[in-house]
Amino acid sequence: MEKSLHLEIVTPDRLVLSEKVDYVGAPGYEGEFGILPNHIPFLSALNIGSLYYKAGGKTHWIFVSGGFAEVSDNKVTVLAESAERAEDIDLERARKAKERAEQRLAQAKEKLDSARAQAALQRAMARMRVRGAA
């Protein structure tokens, strides 16, 4: 039996991560799910939030802005709309994005404006949480 997984995180722009890991935790739409070596194959949609993995006794955090996770043959492939390692997140920029989203939400007149502002707020807050976990 395998004792590790290969985790690959890909966005439309780049390969964010490709490494051997011991565990992956990801933000699914029905809540967080975890993946250990020798997990059964499955495919899941990802919500905006914190993906984390354990490797070498350390926990590493990555912000993901939705996407999909596929598990098969001890490989976890994450196709994310965007992804940032915790150490790469500019906390001040995330705070400003949160403030802008809150202002837009307060001024939203249409449902579409409100939905966009809510999504922007959710992304900014998730980025701040991920950065704080690093």
From Swiss-Prot:
SUPFAM superfamilies reported in the protein's UniProt record: Epsilon subunit of F1F0-ATP synthase C-terminal domain, Epsilon subunit of F1F0-ATP synthase N-terminal domain
The keyword Membrane belongs to this UniProt entry's keyword annotation: yes
Alphabetical list of InterPro entries matching this protein: ATP_F1_dsu/esu_C_sf, ATP_synth_F1_dsu/esu, ATP_synth_F1_dsu/esu_N, ATP_synth_F1_esu_C, ATPsynth_dsu/esu_N
Keywords annotated in UniProt: ATP synthesis, Cell inner membrane, Cell membrane, CF(1), Hydrogen ion transport, Ion transport, Membrane, Transport
Species name: Nitratidesulfovibrio vulgaris (strain DSM 19637 / Miyazaki F)
Gene3D superfamilies reported for this sequence: ATP synthase delta/epsilon subunit, C-terminal domain, F0F1 ATP synthase delta/epsilon subunit, N-terminal
Mode of membrane association: Peripheral membrane protein
Oligomer status and interactors: F-type ATPases have 2 components, CF(1) - the catalytic core - and CF(0) - the membrane proton channel. CF(1) has five subunits: alpha(3), beta(3), gamma(1), delta(1), epsilon(1). CF(0) has three main subunits: a, b and c.
Entry keyword annotation includes Cell inner membrane: yes
Family affiliation: Belongs to the ATPase epsilon chain family.
Location in the cell: Cell inner membrane
GO cellular component, one term: proton-transporting ATP synthase complex
Protein name per the record: ATP synthase epsilon chain
Superkingdom of origin organism: Bacteria
